[in-house]
Amino acid sequence: DVYPTFAEQYTDETVQNNSLVVECGERSRFIDYDDIYVQEANMYSYSYSTSFDGEGAITSAIDYVTTEDLPQLYVLEGHGEKDLPENFKEQIEKENIETNTLFLLNVDAIPEEADVILIYEPSSDLSEEEVDMLYQYAEDGGKLLVMAGPTQDGTLENLYGLLENYGVETCEGIVVEGNRDNYTMQPHILLPEMSSNEITDSLIEENYYPNMPISQGMIINDESG
């Protein structure tokens, strides 16, 4: 290599040939070759497929280095929440969303810069004080993304009470699908049909098929929220 240490100012990773660096001002984004040509394993057929995502990776990098204020996602903690899946974290990074953690019991208010608060699979319920803070945050225009389901220790009464303000009522038990077209392997591992909107369009375009195992039942009240 002509400049063997050039990439060290941009990344700590081992740099492969044909990797890229996008830079603008004080910001930069390293694009690994494996993020340009993405290899995925099919565990059912024991085969691998390779797809080209260079356009998506470069577009994301350009957006990152040229955007002054990036969206701020705060991930709630303190209730035995599970770690975010790696593919989910990778997608968040690709969308240039910065992540932070949020522990509500030692703050007086939710940070003003929080664009979205994510509640991901808590194993214990939120306190009434925490729910009040989240409710006020949402009333002031904040956004909540809640991914929660059945827990071993019972229901998440306070959290589900918060959701009822927005027309979502939970049911006891899990959803079991009777239509073979809408589950994989077992009737409790759901294959949802995705409608087109700004959240799901990228999944549809890239031919992702999310599965939802052990899903909590919900009743949607159109008259609420």
Predicted regions and their residues:
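Short, surface-exposed patches at the edges or C-terminal ends of soluble domains, predominantly
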Residues: 1-225
